[in-house]
Design a protein with these regions (language model features):
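Domain-scale signature associated with acetyltransferase and cell-envelope carbohydrate enzymes
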Residues: 1-117, 140-141, 159, 175, ...
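Glycine-rich hexapeptide-repeat left-handed beta-helix
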Residues: 13, 104-106, 110-184
């Protein structure tokens, strides 16, 4: 690992600026943002929509080209909800998009490019009108969603389960298992 050669006061200034950015720009976008949120480069986080609740000790890692996206686009005003438990981690490029409800338990990890959605967003032939068929997604405690894996609508993943890289989860996953493939 590379040694940090910045003077201490520069590092403290950066940490203070990052904390202020979280306080003034990230926290107002959430219904609840727990304490000890560690958001690396918080100016690259996209949080949009109502009813987003993030637990304590949330960590998000962002880059210029791979932003973290958390978004609610409910069918009506004030509809849709995302709830992240305590100690959740979102890696660069990970996305959570809710139309109805997405709930992540405590200690969940989303690897680089992971995608969780609870809706198809539009029909196959009629792409103008929105598809209203959305069903909630629930991830239990300590679930790890691998690199570029996708979790689709209506899926429940049990505690301590792992979704392998590039997998597409279309059905429920029991607790304490590893799933892989397309579909997983």
């Amino acid at each position: 690992m590379r040694e940090d050669l910045r003077p201490f006061w520069v590092k403290q200034l950066y940490v203070s600026f990052r904390a202020a950015w979280i306080h003034w720009f990230i926290r107002p976008r959430c219904v609840h943002l727990g304490v000890h949120a560690a958001i690396m480069s918080p100016w690259y986080v996209d949080i949009s929509g109502p009813n987003i609740s993030i637990g304590h000790s949330f960590t998000a890692i962002n880059t210029v080209s791979q932003r973290v996206h958390i978004g609610v686009w409910g069918r009506g005003v004030g509809e849709g909800r995302i709830m992240l438990g305590n100690a959740c981690l979102m890696s660069p490029g990970s996305r959570i998009s809710a139309s109805d409800e997405i709930v992540l338990g405590d200690g969940c990890m989303l690897a680089n490019g992971a995608y969780i959605t609870d809706s198809d967003w539009h029909g196959l032939y009629n792409r103008i009108d929105r598809d209203d068929a959305s069903t909630p997604v629930r991830l239990g405690d300590n679930v790890w969603v691998g690199d570029h894996a996708t979790v689709l609508k209506g899926v429940t993943i049990g505690d301590n389960s792992v979704v392998a890289a590039r997998s597409v989860v279309t059905k429920n996953v029991p607790a304490n298992v590893v799933v892989a493939g397309n579909p997983a």
